[in-house]
Amino acid sequence: MLPVIAIVGRPNVGKSTLFNYLTKSRAALVADVPGVTRDRQYGETTIDSQRLLLVDTGGLVDTENKEVAPLAETQVEQAIDESDCILFLVDAKAGLVPADEIIAERLHKKGKKIFLAVNKADRARAAVVQSDFYKLGFGEPYVIAAASGRGVKDLMTQVLENLPEEKEVIEKEVGIKIAMIGRPNVGKSTLINRLLGEERVIVYDQPGTTRDSIYIPFARNDENYTLIDTAGIRRRAKIQDYVEKFSMIKSLQAMHAADVVIFLLDARQGVTEQDLRLLNRIVEAGVSLIIAVNKWDGLNIEERDNVRNAIDRRMPFVDFARRYFISALHGTGVGKLFRAIQESYQSIQQELTTGQLTRALEKAVAEHEPPLVKGRRIRLRYAHLGARHPLTIVVHGKKTKSLPQSYSRYLANYFRKTFNFIGVPVHIKLKTDPNPYEGQEER
């Protein structure tokens, strides 16, 4: 599971600035989907080969007319509880204020590893600033400038060194890892029961990392699977009895840990903004996607047509994903999900050599050439596999920075069709080859 770092502090201390600085590297790989409201409170970053999930709690608190919003019973409380460690940000220019002390008192009760970072500090006053905030009780503060990044690397190096070790909970032969993602009350727990089946074989059910995620291995038709329970579904006395609680953090962790995501829609409620935001996150994670539209049996013909039209209209950015119209309660259509899981997983495991990808690139260019830039055609030379999770194909060429996003989407679709990637979002990463003559004086 991705380690979670929560950025906490009172308003206007620079939480979003630090969040944006740490996550800016993702912008080159993942573009916003048109028409989808981007959720800016959660972001992924990679530091020294360690992938992290960052949570900017500043976007989660209603601070209107309040100096310090209450932490209790808010998403901030949930984010803090589900994090592995906390970056507590304060403002050097404002100095230590009562709001900082109130937050510090609450954080001390959490039992988490907390790093105190003093933002907006001049180098000349670093020692003075550190002594002012030392009384908060989190050890020596780290002096940073989030806007420029000064001091941030040293801070994050210490964060990485203090992350709790993840426990090994999955044995070797557990098969395909499946995550169930969806809004609250769309039928996730019912579908999980249906997937596990009446004659299920539960190998084990034990806590995973410090965030208490749970892996549930099971077998069906001699095939092994593992259900990743990180969306807040917890067993009670009986396995049939589940309690559901939505968590964006655990949903994001599930996406990144899974081989295949089943995204569940409620046919009676249609496509909501929250559905679109979750789908956007799944595309970013690059995991294989299957869309299951639940409670289908309760709709008449006209209502079904309306739902299909709404999906076509509002979800064109996931048109690569297979759709299944099901009833988790009665089991209608659920059997097809297992075939889709197998096919989707196998398609992403196929061999992808540089030669194969380059030949596909050449055919794509021959069928639809890149546009002209200042009268010259953008040249794409070769392609190779950058990563499988997310599936990233790196395309090398000249002047690739000028390639429009529409052409990158064309290439992604072409690769998907050529290699029959089933339900897999394809990310295109463009690289411009160095110009050997750049920087030389004209003669």
Swiss-Prot record:
GTPase that plays an essential role in the late steps of ribosome biogenesis. Belongs to the TRAFAC class TrmE-Era-EngA-EngB-Septin-like GTPase superfamily. EngA (Der) GTPase family. This is GTPase Der. The keyword Nucleotide-binding applies. GTP 1 binds at residues 9-16, 56-60, 119-122. Pfam families: KH_dom-like, MMR_HSR1. The keyword Glycoprotein does not apply. GO terms for biological process: ribosome biogenesis. Residues 350-434 form the KH-like domain. GTP 2 binds at residues 182-189, 229-233, 294-297. Residues 3-167, 176-349 form the EngA-type G domain. Associates with the 50S ribosomal subunit. InterPro entries: G_ENGA, GTP-bd, GTPase_Der, KH_dom-like, KH_dom-like_a/b, P-loop_NTPase, Small_GTP-bd. Keywords: GTP-binding, Nucleotide-binding, Repeat, Ribosome biogenesis. GO terms for molecular function: GTP binding; ribosome binding.
